[in-house]
A protein has these predicted regions:
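Glycine-enriched, solvent-exposed interface loops adjoining structured elements
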Residues: 1-183
Length: 183
């Protein structure tokens, strides 16, 4: 699913009808402004989904210099949190800092981390299993609250939160099985 698909869906839900948002020449000034606002909302909502519900996990071969790995050297430097650092088959301890991670060795390793997308545009492909209609509800809620449309924002946010909770419950993530004990 592309960002443009989400924004097209938002245009329909906001009452503008079916509009090709990728054709910038045929958009009015108001529609162009709305596309820019909705693009920012897509970034905010998708970042929340990645950070809180469904992480976008990346794995990368890296080189630690002086026992440090600078985030700026990664393919995607917008890191949310580190998951693991492996040297061969062995998982090594890491300590996260704002601009780098530190470990107890220097050299080659495999780094696994949760990251945000580097940038958002109409042609950006969104990873994950969140359907377009659900992401659109979150974007509309974000847009509505920013423009003081409280009722519309509350309705869209309710649908978004319920949909995310249902999707997370069915994805197998977050399930907790109570430990059983022998009597």
């Amino acid at each position: 699913m592309k960002v443009s698909d989400v924004i097209k869906n938002c245009f329909v839900k906001l009452g503008y009808g079916v509009i090709d948002v990728t054709d910038a020449e045929n958009l009015t000034a108001e529609q162009k402004r709305l596309v820019d606002i909705l693009l920012c909302s897509v970034e905010n909502v998708h970042s929340e989904i990645i950070s809180a519900y469904f992480p976008f996990v990346m794995t990368e071969n890296v080189t630690l210099v002086d026992e440090k790995l600078q985030y700026s050297t990664l393919i995607n430097p917008k890191i949310v949190y580190p998951i693991s650092l492996k040297r061969g088959a062995e998982t090594r301890k890491i300590k996260a800092y704002p601009t780098y991670i530190q470990s107890d060795f220097s050299g080659e390793a495999t780094f696994e981390y949760c990251a945000l997308l580097p940038s958002y545009s109409l042609s950006t492909e969104l990873p994950g299993n969140v359907p377009c209609w659900l992401l659109s509800e979150g974007v509309i809620a974000e847009y509505a609250y920013a423009n003081n449309l409280i009722d519309l924002g509350a309705q869209a946010e309710k649908k978004f939160r319920e949909g995310i909770c249902a999707l997370k419950a069915h994805s197998g993530a977050g399930r907790y099985v109570k430990p059983r004990r022998w009597a």
